[in-house]
């Protein structure tokens, strides 16, 4: 038995988590007590995050659709098929979707491939705020020292460890004001003042000062809020949705809100999706797609619609880095081997590039990390 230190993939807080491994299988989790963010505390989602590794719909082999059914294929067959299809489309008709659930290295590799093809690329931030992270320097640790905490949206339901920091600050005497479009009991319970708003555009920030931190987890214009905060010397902490939403953005992949994301999908003929599942929300956004490739860890609703499905490794089966919501670069560590023929996302992308006759300039994870560093992206 061994214990592997890594980072929880459940949200953007970036909590440390220990995976308990026995006979090359993760059998449980244990608090990473020395981790600076969560100090050994993990929410229920974090404690159960390893269970996705053994999901009943876990992908283990490449699949190609033949006569309306997805059947097993070799990697060579699947990648050759994709490469041949790609050659039939103009760059304007080709779209690649990156993911805030994949590592920096995976997303960077995908961006390099897309740049070589001059195609379109984006990643969905869902209902998270769209942020210029160069303007953000606030950390999660700043929450406990704030005298006045304003929350726009909800950090208690999906980002429990940030919620915990807010509660600790409140116990020290901080005033907590929460603005939300829904009247949730968990928000009312933890607020000194709860304000229901029809729109997040109606949030009143007239009383912010140097002792204020504004925590945002809602689709708002963060630039305007940052401007107001700077004028009053307040701090702003945007909260991203996924474990590496921030990383995907900093790597240089356009961050798309839900409407922008769906519009991009609707205008794509060749669509390659890495680690996302838009069909779960609306299958109709894919109705104009002529050829669909899905690269993922399980058979999702989107993968079921695909012409080719490529099995990738999950967070516990690879090395790499995530960037959390306050821009900390953190290393994830491989704990177990992947099932079947599943491959790391970056390696799948490199292999596809080779089928297209393109050299992306890297042969290892370390090569990618050096390239990222050389280009001063992170």
UniProtKB/Swiss-Prot annotation:
The record's section on Pfam families has: Molybdop_Fe4S4, Molybdopterin
Task: Give a GO cellular-component term.
Answer: membrane
Question: What is the enzyme's class at the highest EC level?
Answer: oxidoreductase
As cofactor, the record names: [4Fe-4S] cluster; Mo-bis(molybdopterin guanine dinucleotide)
4Fe-4S Mo/W bis-MGD-type domain residues = 1-57
What biological-process GO terms show up in the record?
Answer: respiratory electron transport chain
- Keywords, A to Z? 4Fe-4S, Iron, Iron-sulfur, Metal-binding, Molybdenum, Oxidoreductase
Q: What is its EC number?
A: 1.-.-.-
Q: Which SUPFAM superfamilies match?
A: Formate dehydrogenase/DMSO reductase, domains 1-3 (SSF53706)
Q: How is the cofactor bound?
A: Binds 1 [4Fe-4S] cluster. Binds 1 molybdenum-bis(molybdopterin guanine dinucleotide) (Mo-bis-MGD) cofactor per subunit.
Q: Tell me which residues bind [4Fe-4S] cluster.
A: 8, 11, 15, 43
GO molecular function terms here? 4 iron, 4 sulfur cluster binding; metal ion binding; oxidoreductase activity
- Family indicated by similarity: Belongs to the prokaryotic molybdopterin-containing oxidoreductase family.
User: What is this protein's record name?
Assistant: Uncharacterized oxidoreductase MJ0006
Q: Which organism is this entry from? A: Methanocaldococcus jannaschii (strain ATCC 43067 / DSM 2661 / JAL-1 / JCM 10045 / NBRC 100440)
């Amino acid at each position: 038995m061994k214990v592997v230190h890594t980072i929880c993939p459940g949200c953007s807080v970036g909590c440390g988590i220990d995976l308990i491994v026995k006979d090359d299988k993760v059998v449980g989790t244990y608090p990473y007590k020395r981790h600076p963010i969560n100090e050994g505390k993990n929410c229920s989602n974090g404690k159960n995050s390893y269970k996705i590794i053994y999901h009943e719909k876990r992908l283990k082999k490449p699949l190609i659709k033949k006569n309306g059914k997805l059947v097993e294929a070799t990697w060579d067959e699947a990648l050759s098929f994709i490469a041949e299809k790609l050659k039939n489309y103009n760059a304007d008709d080709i779209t690649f979707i990156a993911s805030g659930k994949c590592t920096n290295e995976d997303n960077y590799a995908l961006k390099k491939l897309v740049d070589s093809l001059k195609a379109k690329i984006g990643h969905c931030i869902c209902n998270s705020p769209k942020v210029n992270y160069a303007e953000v320097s606030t950390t999660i640790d700043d929450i406990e020292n704030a005298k006045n905490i304003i929350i726009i949206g909800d950090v208690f339901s999906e980002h429990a460890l940030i919620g915990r920091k807010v509660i600790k600050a409140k116990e020290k005497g901080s005033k907590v004001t929460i603005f939300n479009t829904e009247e949730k009991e968990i928000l009312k319970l933890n607020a000194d003042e709860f304000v229901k708003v029809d729109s997040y555009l109606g949030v009143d920030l007239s009383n912010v000062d140097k002792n204020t931190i504004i925590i945002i987890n809602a689709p708002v214009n963060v630039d305007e809020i940052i401007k107001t905060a700077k004028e009053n010397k307040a701090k702003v902490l945007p909260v991203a949705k996924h474990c590496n939403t921030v990383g995907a953005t900093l790597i240089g992949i356009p961050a798309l809100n839900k409407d922008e994301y769906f519009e991009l999908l609707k205008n794509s003929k060749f669509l390659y999706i890495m680690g996302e599942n838009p069909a779960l929300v609306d299958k109709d956004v894919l109705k104009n797609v002529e050829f669909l490739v899905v690269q993922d860890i399980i058979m999702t609703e989107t993968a079921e619609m695909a012409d080719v499905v490529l099995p990738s490794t999950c967070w516990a089966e690879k090395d790499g880095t995530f960037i959390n919501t306050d821009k900390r670069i953190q290393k994830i560590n491989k704990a177990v081997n992947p099932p079947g023929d599943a491959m790391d996302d970056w390696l799948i992308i490199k292999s596809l590039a080779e089928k297209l006759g393109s050299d992306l300039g890297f042969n290892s994870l370390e090569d990618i990390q050096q390239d990222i560093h050389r280009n001063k992206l992170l």
